[in-house]
Amino acid sequence: MTAHLPILIVIIPLFVAMAARLLVRLSVPFTRGFVLAAALAVLASGAVALAETLVRGEPWRYYVSGWPPPWGIELVIDPLAGGLIVLVAFFGLAALVYAGPYLQGRTPREQGSFYALFLLAKAGLLGMCATGDLFNLYVFLEISSLAAYALIAFGGRRSIVAALRYLIIGTAAACFYLLGVGYLYAMTGSLNMADLAVLLPPLMDSPVVILALVFIVAGLGIKMALFPLHGWLPDAYSYTPAPVLAFMAAVMTKVSAYALYRILYFVTEAAGPVSPTLQVLGWMAAAGILFGSIMAIAQRDLWRMLAYSSVAQVGYIVLGLAVGNVLALYGALLHVLSHALVKGGLFFIAGGVSWETGVRRVSDFVGIAKKMPLTMGAFVAAALSMIGLPPTLGFFSKWYLVLGCLEAGAWVFVAVLVVSSLLTAVYFFRVIENAYLKGLPQPGARAERPVPPGARRFRLELPASMLVPILVLGIGVVVLGLFNEQIISNVIQYALPWRLP
């Protein structure tokens, strides 16, 4: 069974997605338990696969049906892919746990559709992490994207427009990527990443190869919301249900960034014409960092504030990839983990506050810390990590990015990182000031939930299934910050291109 872990990581959510749509007709509680058990199994499988890869000291290559590439489909799990698989699986489980109260008012059919679509999106992302060829990366990208379009529409009437817009832009992105892959296949006759890494270097001066890379970078840039290709993100993030949004914000853009990193550093080895590509990406990332931070300050709705903040944070990751030295790559890969934990937690918090009080506007957060102290405590921890204050994980990821930029002599990028941190402090401290330093809680869209006669007066500020993921992530950004050196030395340093065969 262990020998087949790479394929099981992808197959389990696919089969459970189909089963959930049928089982929900018999019993909703059983279906939910079944889905959660499957999500836990995927997380455990991913952790075992990552550990096995680290112990082996080489990538774990799995040939589907025993056919080796280029005729068969190859799955490859190395420390980079394994770490991201664990991250996707963890957030998939956390979001499913969190979604319980959100789904209580839904019909069994709607709940079954939600579970099926969510698991399809998760399977697509896991497949993107594990695949060893460019075409199947496209297939898994489309599986996750199509499911995401439908999940966004679960948010209500306004979310349907956002989902349609994302569908149109996302389809264009997929076409760009597929066109680029087609050009590479026409030039090399292979889609396998390992084969392309050997076949492409002699062809790197070809205009066709250069055009192919431009299309691939453009397609993945749209998917990861890299400025100025981010137009779909603010509306999509503003109207998506919180469990889905936390999952999307935490891992969907990160997996696209992973795919970009894979192609630039492992397939093309960042040589020849790719170097100008990295320079362009660096300036796009720097512009996105400033643009996202400034636009976040201008927002009055917390969800849109966090959405524009994501544009800036994607810029941090791409900036590290563009600078490209060891320290910058440490910072970029560590920021993938940091931002996933922080932004996933922040959207869990935003959803919990909205679910309990109806509050979404920053100005309505006045005094809310008195009503929801644990939730807002986690918010403060996440905000400090976003700003980049020690000992949170966000401080260390930004620290490595700054060191990498200094080593490269990129002083402008250093200034961008510092200014962005100050801007981030402005829009997060505005929320913290309202929550802790001003007055009593303001009435939101709903009145406070009444306590039934005869019930205990004490109750948690949120249902346990919502509060536990929030607290785990809030504590996690601090604890993992304290262990950042171990994360780098035991996982991230083995994910650099020159450490992998």
Swiss-Prot record:
It is an enzyme of class 7 (translocase). InterPro entries: CPA3_Na-H_Antiporter_D, NADH-Q_OxRdtase_suN/2, NADH_UbQ_OxRdtase, ND/Mrp_TM. The chain crosses the membrane at residues 4-24, 34-54, 80-100, 112-132, 134-154, 167-187, 207-227, 241-261, 278-298, 314-334, 335-355, 376-396, 409-429, 463-483. It is found in: Cell membrane. GO terms for cellular component: plasma membrane. It comes from the Bacteria. It catalyses: a quinone + NADH + 5 H(+)(in) = a quinol + NAD(+) + 4 H(+)(out). GO terms for biological process: ATP synthesis coupled electron transport. Its EC number is 7.1.1.-. Disulfide bonds: none annotated. Keywords: Cell membrane, Membrane, NAD, Quinone, Translocase, Transmembrane, Transmembrane helix, Transport. It is a multi-pass membrane protein. GO terms for molecular function: NADH dehydrogenase (ubiquinone) activity; NADH:ubiquinone reductase (non-electrogenic) activity; quinone binding. NDH-1 is composed of 14 different subunits. Subunits NuoA, H, J, K, L, M, N constitute the membrane sector of the complex. PANTHER family: NA(+)_H(+) ANTIPORTER SUBUNIT D1, NADH DEHYDROGENASE. NDH-1 shuttles electrons from NADH, via FMN and iron-sulfur (Fe-S) centers, to quinones in the respiratory chain. The immediate electron acceptor for the enzyme in this species is believed to be a menaquinone. Couples the redox reaction to proton translocation (for every two electrons transferred, four hydrogen ions are translocated across the cytoplasmic membrane), and thus conserves the redox energy in a proton gradient. Belongs to the complex I subunit 2 family. This is NADH-quinone oxidoreductase subunit N.
